[in-house]
Amino acid sequence: MPTIKQLIRNTRQPIRNVTKSPALGGCPQRRGTCTRVYTITPKKPNSALRKVARVRLTSGFEITAYIPGIGHNSQEHSVVLVRGGRVKDLPGVRYHIVRGTLDAVGVKDRQQGRSQYGVKKPK
């Protein structure tokens, strides 16, 4: 515990909260262009080929974003919408691509949890 004299000399500094998605610049989503679409392998206990894209955002940042769902049509020069949200087993992947908007089509034949994957209600 500091003494009164120490507190007079230096006031307490407020705790600065660091944003988990700095590339979005306080916005809920940002538009970007895919520069590279590829797969990476997850951290230790898991095993898969996770689909990710390198995206150049309108804010000027170049980020790695996860492509959720089974199958995708994203390729180089695709214009995509990016939201925050990390992928726990992929180090350095702190963003998700929003399916069903711009050039990223929704997941084919999806019946449940459609909202997350940009799929309209089946007739």
UniProtKB/Swiss-Prot annotation:
A Gene Ontology term for the protein's cellular component: chloroplast
Subcellular location: Plastid, Chloroplast
A UniProt-annotated Pfam family: Ribosom_S12_S23
Stored CDD domains: Ribosomal_S12 (cd03368)
Keywords per UniProt: Chloroplast, Plastid, Ribonucleoprotein, Ribosomal protein, RNA-binding, rRNA-binding
Residue ranges of the TM segments: none
GO biological process annotation, one example: translation
Keyword Hydrolase attached: no
GO MF annotation: an example: structural constituent of ribosome
Family assignment from sequence similarity: Belongs to the universal ribosomal protein uS12 family.
Subunit: Part of the 30S ribosomal subunit.
Name the record gives this protein: Small ribosomal subunit protein uS12cz
Origin species: Populus trichocarpa (Western balsam poplar)
Lineage: Eukaryota, Viridiplantae, Streptophyta, Embryophyta, Tracheophyta
